[in-house]
């Protein structure tokens, strides 16, 4: 599972997910991509499950890029604990995703294969996504 090796602080505020993605919203590496259309916190487990699904479907062909990384710790209190006495310990890591952010990119496979792989991958994610193709006019 993905998680940072080292962070400056152990815990973070929850924050807000306002607006749409201004960075990471264009295809940079591959020919086909899966783009988020809703805001979400993607857990490292969800990212890993999606990665496995795509690599299993395309088998040995193609190259996959994961364009998101879970760098935000989410804390949780133990079950049946009274209120107070500070914030809970970090439980898992999430990637903050805004609408328009590219999640995965793929190349080296036919468009039909890439589209089916991304469709199967989208079932592992808790949001609506969109399959996009790199413009051939871009250089």
Swiss-Prot record:
Keyword list, A-Z: Chloroplast, Plastid, Ribonucleoprotein, Ribosomal protein
One of the record's GO cellular component terms: chloroplast
GO biological process entries: mitochondrial translation
One Gene Ontology MF term: rRNA binding
Domain of life: Eukaryota
Biased composition (Basic residues): 1-17
Pfam families documented for this protein: Ribosomal_L16
PROSITE patterns: RIBOSOMAL_L16_1 (PS00586), RIBOSOMAL_L16_2 (PS00701)
Localisation: Plastid, Chloroplast
InterPro entries (UniProt xref): Ribosomal_uL16, Ribosomal_uL16_bact-type, Ribosomal_uL16_CS, Ribosomal_uL16_dom, Ribosomal_uL16_sf
Keyword Ribonucleoprotein in annotation: yes
Disordered: annotated span: 1-23
Entry keyword annotation includes Ribonucleoprotein: yes
Subunit structure: Part of the 50S ribosomal subunit.
Protein family membership: Belongs to the universal ribosomal protein uL16 family.
NCBIfam families assigned to the protein according to its UniProt record, in alphabetical order: rplP_bact
Protein name (record): Large ribosomal subunit protein uL16c
Organism: Pyropia yezoensis
Lineage, uppermost ranks: Eukaryota, Rhodophyta, Bangiophyceae, Bangiales, Bangiaceae
């Amino acid at each position: 599972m993905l998680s940072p090796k080292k962070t400056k602080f152990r815990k973070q505020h929850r924050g807000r997910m306002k607006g749409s993605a201004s960075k990471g919203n264009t295809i940079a590496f591959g020919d086909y991509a899966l783009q988020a259309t809703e805001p979400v916190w993607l857990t490292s487990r969800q990212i890993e499950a999606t990665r496995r699904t795509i690599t299993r479907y395309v088998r040995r062909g193609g190259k996959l890029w994961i364009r998101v990384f879970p760098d935000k710790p989410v804390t949780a209190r133990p079950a049946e604990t009274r209120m107070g006495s500070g914030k809970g310990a970090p439980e898992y890591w999430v990637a903050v995703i805004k609408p328009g952010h590219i999640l995965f990119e793929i190349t080296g496979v036919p468009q039909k294969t890439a589209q089916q792989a991304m469709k199967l991958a989208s079932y592992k994610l808790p949001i609506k996504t969109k399959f996009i193709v790199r413009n051939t006019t871009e250089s």
